[in-house]
Amino acid sequence: MLLANTAAAVLLLIVCIGASVGLPTVDEENVVQAEQLPILPTADSSKPTDDTVKAIAPQPRYLLPADFAVKNKKFTIGTLGVGSFFRAWRNCIDEGKGLATIESEKEQKYLESLLKASSTGSNYWIGATNIGASNTNKLTWITTDLPVQTKPPFLNVVAKSTCIALTPTGSWTLRNCLNPLNIFPYICEEYF
């Protein structure tokens, strides 16, 4: 049963990563600015004709950061038990949230205090992983597919299939995503 669940989780991850690889990334070079759009002549330059509208090819859509227009983030300890990294990711989704991303020192400090106060003595999954990365030392947030920019400088990720958990003191620790013995509670985030 555990092997079947692990295989299903790996298959789900491969499908999700495959889908996200096909999306172009957002950076200043590939975002079309308004002044770059072609200006086509029309019979009456105050309003475009149907031919003008058809002549302007639709621009590709880009994946924008998940917090594009969001003001506040709230962290919660997952309520659906413990599990593997992929189960934690799925559980957060089932709770209507995402697996936690840490995007500032302030968020890191908050989570450290939250975990110290919980005193469970357990690690907690967050959304950082190198699965799907071309360089094993590059982590991305599984929730947003954006690069992790808050990685502690001492953290040296060298193995493939690495996921990050927070220790009971809030420090980052490396864990093999595919090891069935790595079963932890998890931290979710939600925006409001």
From Swiss-Prot:
User: Quick check: keyword Endoplasmic reticulum in the entry?
Assistant: no
One GO MF annotation is: carbohydrate binding
* Keyword tags: Disulfide bond, Lectin, Signal
Would you indicate the residue range of the signal peptide?
A: 1-22
InterPro entries, alphabetized = C-type_lectin-like, C-type_lectin-like/link_sf, CTDL_fold
Give yes or no: UniProt keyword Lipid metabolism.
no
Q: Which GO terms describe its biological process?
A: immune response
Q: List the disulfide bonds.
A: C163-C177
* Coiled coil (residue ranges): none
Any GO CC annotation of this UniProt entry = external side of plasma membrane
Q: What is the annotated tissue distribution of the protein whose record heads this document?
A: Expressed in the gut of adults.
Domain C-type lectin, residue spans: 71-186
Q: What conditions trigger expression of this protein? A: Not induced by bacterial challenge in larvae.
Q: Do you know which Pfam families this protein is assigned to?
A: Lectin_C
Can you name this protein? Answer: Protein A16
